Structures are given as structure tokens and as C-alpha cells.
Amino acid sequence: MENSERIKKWKEERAKVAQESRASRLQQKEDERALRQTEKSADAKSHHNPDAGWSATDADSVRRASLVIKERRVQQAKQSLRRLFLYIALPLLVIMLMSWILTSHFYSADATFIVQTDASQDNFSGTSFFGAGNKMSEGFQVREFILSKEMMDRMEKELGFLSYFAQDDIALFSRFHAPLGINDDPYRYYLSKVSVAVDIQQGMLRLNVKARSAKQAEFFAQRILSFAEQHVNTVSARMQKERILWLENDVKSAQENLGAARLELLKIQHIQKDIDPKETITAIYQLIAGFETQLAEAKAEYAQLMVNGLDQNPLIPRLSAKIKVLEKQIGEQRNRLSNKLGSQGSSESLSLFEDLRLQSEIAKARWESALQTLQQGKLQALRERQYLLIISQPMAESDTTRYADGTKWLLFFVLLGITYLVTSLLITIRRMRE
């Protein structure tokens, strides 16, 4: 029972101390309030009577002066805050509300596509698309075309893209060619509504198009992809045409060289009346050798008859005639080797004929090589034909961006106002603590 009594007594003393402390604080606040009212009235009287003042030696007067100074600082801080709200916070709030009211809500349509060839289709990946074969440049070329002024002009000419955003139902800050020079640059406005992002890791390009409605955003995105596909097909066809045309011209040139070499060969054959002068000369030498053999045999037989005293033999006249005929034929064949037939003789034109035949063979080999290269070039051109492949069709979603480019300056003023507000609060708190 003694312990419980001690606890009870301790609680009563604690409650009594708390009550006395509370009463003391209330009394102190009441005294300070009464003192402030007294000092305010005294301060008002001091404006009419400048000689009135407090005694510096009085401790209560010093305390009252300190409270008055602190009260004045509090009033100045409150006045600064009111001015801050009136001249900065309130205008910024009005501007922000106007920005929300004067900007339109847009829908954003996203589509994913790639640019590839038949050769890279089988083993397509992000690395093969952008890493090998300089495929990255092809993707960036399509991106630059979509974001070019040429595409902007075509979209405006065929679809009225910029005119669509200049309608009165679009808010002032989001409208194209709005009053006061807002959104007056057509190309910059076009880039604010059309963008293309390149994902190097995935090897894809993502198209983003904004419009007032989801259906219109998807329509514009689909048309941009169609124009980009036409551009890729046109560039690819032009590259193939130029390559094949060059190869065909090379084949044509080789064929013309072959025809010229064969024509020169036919001319020399026509002049010499020989298909192959070398074979003709060989045949002449064989004829001369055969005639000389027969002539030697006839002369030997004739001499044998004469040695035996058979000069009256009936074979003698026939052998004599044979010898004369053989000698005449040998002479004619030798004249064929030495005399000129037309502009060249057979022996003299042999080197010229060999040169022409060699040139003809070289021209034929070059023509066959050019023809084979043309066939390979056509196959390679088919494999390297570029085309635009759409991975995902345009799908529209609500765009969370509500501000046009003309309202970006608002963020700067908001940050500036917040900085000024925080600085003013810190200064006020410091003055109040002093």
C-alpha cells in the first residue's frame, strides 16, 4: 500500500506541476499580448510626439523594445510573403492555368519498322542489321528522310498535315500559325508532331506521330510509312538499275571489241583468200615437197634410161614432159610464198594474222567474263534489294504531353519562383530567430 500511495502522490505532484506550467505559459502569453497592445499605442503616440521615448535604464523598457522589434520583423515577413504571392505565385498560377486551358490534348501513334535486304532476312538480328554491312546507315537514311522538309512538303501537299493543325478547334498554344507568332516555323512544328527514334540494341526504328484524334494519328503514321516505303523502293531500284546498266554497258563494250577483232580477222582472210594463212603456208610447203620428190624420181629414171643408151625409149618423152610440169608447179607454189596476193603475201601476213587472232581470243574471253559478271550482278542486286518492313502497325494512345514548345519558358519561371520562395522563407525564419 505504501508503494501505491507513493505512485499516487507522484502523479498528483506531476499534474500540479503541469497545471502550474500551463498557467504560467498562458499568463506569459497574455502579458506579451497586453504588452504588444500597449507598445502599439505608445508607438502610435510617438509618431505625434517625437521626443517621447523609453528610459534606457529601465529593464522592462529594453524588453518591450525587443518585443516590438521582433513584432515588426514578423509583420515585414508576412508582408513579404503576401507580396511574393501577389506578384509571383499568383501570376505563375494564372499562366499555368492558361497553359492548361490554351493547349490541346493530342493522341500519339507509334509504329515500329526496319529496313533490310533479302540477303539479311534469313539471319536477321539487331546486330546483323546495325552492325554488319553498314546497315545502320540505311536506317538513319530513312529516319532523315522522314524528318526532312521534303517529307513535310509532301505531307502538306497530299494530306494537308500542317493545315490540319491550323484549324480553330485546336487550342492557341498548340495551333500552327497561331496569333502573336506562336508556332510560326513550319519545319519546327512538323518536328514537334513527327519523330523517329532509333533503337540500336533492338535494331529497329520507332515512328511517333501526334494528332488531335487517335484515328487521325494512325492515318498520318500509316501514310508516312507508305511514303518512306516508296522512297526506299525508289532508291533501291535506282541503285540496282545503275549497277546493272554499268554491267550491261561493260558487256556491250566487250561485245563490240570482239566484233571488231573478228571483222579485222575476216578482212585479212578475205584479202588472202585463206581461212588460216598458217595452214595455207604449211600446205604449200607440203605440195612443194611432194612435187620435188616426184621431180627427183622422174629425173633419176630419165637419167637411168639415158645412161643405158635408151634415148629412143618411148618413156623418154613422157618423163621429159612430167619433169617440165613438176618444175612448173614447184615454181608456181614458190611464187605463192613470195608474191603478194592483194596487199599482203601469205608469208608476210602470217604475223599480222596471228596478232588479229590473239586479239579476237582476248576479246572473246573478256566478253565471256563480262557476261558472267552481269549474271552474278543481277543475282546480287536481287539479294541486296532494300525494302521497308513494318514490325508493328501504328497504334494510337493518349499523349500525356500537354504543353507546346511555346510554353517551355513557363517551367523556367516556375523554378525561379520556387527558388525565390524558399530563399525568402529561409531569410524570414532567420530574422524571426534573431
From Swiss-Prot:
Segments for region (Disordered): 1-58
Compositionally biased residues, Basic and acidic residues: 1-50
Membrane topology: Multi-pass membrane protein
One cellular-component annotation, GO: plasma membrane
GO biological process, one term: polysaccharide transport
Coiled-coil segments: none
GO molecular function: carbohydrate:proton symporter activity; protein tyrosine kinase activity
Domain of life: Bacteria
Residue spans crossing the bilayer: 84-104, 409-429
Subcellular location: Cell inner membrane
Key words, A-Z: Capsule biogenesis/degradation, Cell inner membrane, Cell membrane, Membrane, Polysaccharide transport, Sugar transport, Transmembrane, Transmembrane helix, Transport
Keyword Chloroplast set for record: no
Cited function: May form an ATP-driven capsule polysaccharide export apparatus, in association with the VexA, VexB and VexC proteins.
Family: Belongs to the BexC/CtrB/KpsE family.
Name of the protein in question: Vi polysaccharide export inner-membrane protein VexD
Origin species: Salmonella typhi
